UniProtKB/Swiss-Prot annotation:
A GO molecular-function annotation: ATP hydrolysis activity
Keywords assigned: ATP-binding, Helicase, Hydrolase, Mitochondrion, Nucleotide-binding, Nucleus
Designated gene of the protein: dhx32
Gene3D superfamilies associated with the record: 1.20.120.1080, P-loop containing nucleotide triphosphate hydrolases
This protein's GO CC annotations: mitochondrion; spliceosomal complex
Region described as Disordered: spans on this chain: 706-748
UniProt entry tagged with the keyword Lipid biosynthesis: no
Family under the similarity heading: Belongs to the DEAD box helicase family. DEAH subfamily.
EC numbers: 3.6.4.13
Name of the protein in its database record: Putative pre-mRNA-splicing factor ATP-dependent RNA helicase DHX32
């Protein structure tokens, strides 16, 4: 029987009382041997005696700014269903609040479930789980664990789970009311990712259906008022970080903010003042440039200044490359000053304690989706006031840190107050597919904090219709349901389903993993261009980049099957200018996709890569999902005009066709981005006839008149006319084999 509210309140009061006395005992017994304390106290989470490290970390935790609100927070949690917490970076919010919620659930004997805490970045989720397991004196992967894309480090016994907001959103497809959790914590709300906003909206509904569920929303001070109102005047608990910070502004905007930031960095280093430095740049490309520049300059510096150690912190980098804490320290006698280079999205990844200086260029480059041209543009714009204020919290709380703003103070006053929510500036097709899976019909009436752009919603619905993911009533079709099972872009999911019909599942799973993982090609400086060409040339496939990626993965997998050591595999990657981390990620993704295929009982086929028939089948599968991404070379020089609009793009430098004597006339591309040099990435040659065979007639007829469209109709052979066909495609089976196909596609 569920515990009553009065019983919960009594347990919480006892918990708070016990916590206070425990803390007093630890303080008063500082001279007592650790073994004596261990004999007295048992960890309530695993029943084992506390280690001496637990008490050491407890004293560190008590110094965190967030610790001051612990008992106030627990009291609000006991008496309210939804609690909003306002706290800045490095306050301890992400590590301490989940532990307090675990204590709350422990007091209630886990009657209503465990605790889950979402993070905006997978790196943060992994590191926080490890750190919190250490602080709670329990085992990672047992009492405390994490779930991130393509990695699950939890068991049924886990009482505190860290995960990305995307993973919790996907869990809702099989567990709509999140019934396995007693407390749901949404952290880093200010990032305003699409999955974050979707969770915030759904939790309002779930809270009504589950009165026993507790919801904790953690955000920055600037957004707390909005969230309090959004959740019907929910109680607000504020953790103030009051340490002094000196802000230094420039008199005018620098012409070159990038080099101005580097000059200031070197000036600080020459003063010999102690402390590490964080530099916020506009984009990841600038992080790479700054890293190489600092490495070169450091070689010529006076050794008496101490070593300058740059750390490139990419928000979307691999977990294995991420070192967030004192692990960066070493035992060297020579002083080292760490310089963290990151972007605005890297704020929550910075955990170093000794940061005395922050340099902020005040500019960021954001990817904004343009519905008209179906492409992302890299937009340069000033940061928001929320970002500007949060820079101060990065500085060490024990010092009088300095924040150098490379913009005038009046420029700061003109910044927009909040970050733009991602639901207002990204492609919404994956979100709409999820909402349809959750039986949300009136998309325009979903209660988001910021409403998505109606045009973006309409285009997402239209694209899902073209992909045969919707039936005639606008609900998910059988294909749409299966597509939603994959953690992929719907177009890629559709290509995998088509591969089931064309007997090339093995190759499509490999390709899906390679395009989902980070770029496998390493960026080399211009002087190493020849080495780059030799490395990539071995894997080049004349049909295009999709096939080149399959070649690369197959070679890498062959090394693994031959039981090569990790050193040999990494050396092989280095010799061919490939990223070992990216290929490892692709392998993990492929295994996850293979597990999904088996779980929903989709047909699998063995490898057949290399034959002409297999190449054609792969192209057919790709066209089934990417028929909206076709381009034609207009001048024989690699300038491609898109079929869906009149934008022109060039081949990406990583494309194998860049080094070919002749470029193909018609190509299918994976991605088109608008920037200083608009590029199409991952392209393969196709024939107009093959395209006309697989393009949905109602999509082709809706295309605006153009020369490219006319050429496609003229080049069409008599045996492949664009005749009207049934509205819904059946790529998994032939029309006369319906009964068999239904047995092959089962959602469990």
């Amino acid at each position: 029987m569920a515990l009553s509210l009065e019983a919960y309140e009594q347990d919480i009061d006892e918990l708070i009382s016990d916590e206070k006395s425990c803390c007093l005992d630890v303080t008063d017994s500082s001279d007592v041997e650790g073994d004596e304390l261990n004999d007295l106290e048992l960890n309530p989470f695993d029943g084992l005696p506390y280690s001496s490290r637990f008490y050491k970390l407890l004293k560190e935790r008590e110094t965190l700014p967030i610790w001051k609100i612990k008992y106030d927070f627990l009291e609000h949690l006991a008496h309210n269903q939804i609690v909003v917490v306002s706290a800045g970076p490095k306050s301890g919010k992400s590590s301490q609040i989940p532990q307090w919620c675990a204590e709350y659930c422990l007091a209630g004997h886990y009657q209503h479930g465990a605790v889950v805490c979402t993070q905006a970045h997978k790196q943060t989720a992994v590191w926080l789980a490890m750190r919190v397991a250490d602080e709670m004196d329990v085992n990672i992967g047992h009492e405390v664990g994490y779930i991130v894309p393509f990695e699950n480090c939890c068991t049924s016994e886990t009482i505190l789970r860290y995960c990305t907001d995307e993973m919790l959103r996907r869990e809702m497809m099989s567990n709509p009311l999140l019934s396995s959790y007693g407390v749901v914590i949404i952290d880093d709300v200010y990032e305003r990712f699409v999955s974050t906003d979707v969770l915030l909206s759904f939790l309002k509904v779930i809270a009504v259906s589950r009165p026993e569920l507790k919801v904790v929303i953690i955000t920055c001070p600037s957004l707390s008022g909005t969230l309090v109102s959004y959740y019907g005047n929910a109680p607000l608990v504020e953790a103030e970080n009051t340490h002094s910070v000196e802000s230094v502004y420039t008199t005018s905007l620098p012409r070159d903010y990038f080099h101005s930031a580097l000059r200031l960095l070197f000036e600080i280093h020459h003063t010999k003042e102690k402390g590490d430095i964080v530099v916020f740049l506009a984009c990841e490309e600038e992080i790479k440039r700054a890293y190489e520049h600092i490495k070169q300059e450091a070689l010529h510096m006076n050794p008496e200044l101490g070593e300058l150690m740059p750390i490139a912190l990419y928000p979307h980098q691999s977990i294995s490359d991420y070192i967030p804490y004192e692990e960066l320290d070493d035992n060297s006698k020579n002083p080292k000053r760490k310089v963290v280079l990151t972007t605005s999205l890297g704020e929550s990844l910075i955990w170093m304690k000794n940061i005395f200086f922050v340099i902020d260029v005040g500019i960021e480059k954001r990817k904004v989706y343009n519905t008209r041209i179906r492409a992302e543009s890299l937009v340069t714009q000033p940061i928001s006031k929320v970002r500007a204020k949060m820079r101060k919290h990065i500085l060490s709380s024990s010092s009088e840190g300095k924040l150098f703003c490379l913009y005038p103070e009046d420029f700061a006053h003109e910044m927009k107050p909040f970050l733009t929510a991602k639901v207002e500036e990204c492609n919404l097709i994956s979100m709409v597919l999820f909402l349809k899976r959750m039986d949300i019909a009136g998309l325009a009436h979903c209660d988001f904090i910021n409403r998505p752009d109606p045009e973006s919603l309409m285009q997402a619905l239209e694209d899902l219709d073209y992909l045969a993911a919707l039936d005639n009533d606008g609900n998910l079709s059988e294909f749409g349901i299966i597509m939603s099972e994959f953690p992929l872009d719907p177009q890629l999911s559709k290509s995998i389903l088509a591969a089931c019909e064309f007997d090339c599942v093995d190759e499509m799973l490999t390709l899906a993993a390679m395009v989902t993982a980070p770029n496998c090609f390493i960026d080399l400086p211009p002087e190493a261009k020849e080495l780059d060409l030799i490395g990539k040339g071995k894997f080049f496939h004349p049909e295009g980049d999709h096939f080149t990626l399959i070649n690369i993965y197959n070679e890498y997998e062959q090394m693994k099957r031959n039981n090569a050591s990790q050193y040999d595999v990494e050396k092989w990657c280095q010799n061919h200018c490939l990223s070992f981390v990216a290929l490892e990620m692709a392998r993990a993704i492929r295994n996850e996709l293979l597990d999904i295929m088996r779980r929903i009982e989709l047909p699998l086929t063995g490898p057949a890569f290399g034959s002409d028939e297999n190449v054609t089948n792969i192209k057919k599968s790709l066209l089934s999902g990417y028929f909206m991404q076709i381009a034609r070379d207009v001048d024989g020089l690699g300038n491609y005009i898109m079929l869906t609009h009149k934008q022109v793009g060039q081949l990406h430098p990583d494309s194998g066709f860049c080094n070919s004597a002749k470029v193909p006339e018609w190509v299918l591309f994976h991605e088109f981005s608008v920037s200083e040099r608009s590029c199409i990435r991952i392209v393969s040659e196709i024939s107009p006839n093959l395209f006309m065979e697989f393009v949905p007639p109602y999509y082709f007829s809706n295309l605006p008149p153009s020369e490219t469209k006319d050429l496609l109709q003229q080049d069409q052979t008599p045996d492949t006319p664009p005749t009207e066909e049934p509205r819904e495609e059946e790529p998994l089976h032939e029309a006369n084999d319906e009964g068999t196909a239904e047995q092959r596609c089962i959602i469990q």
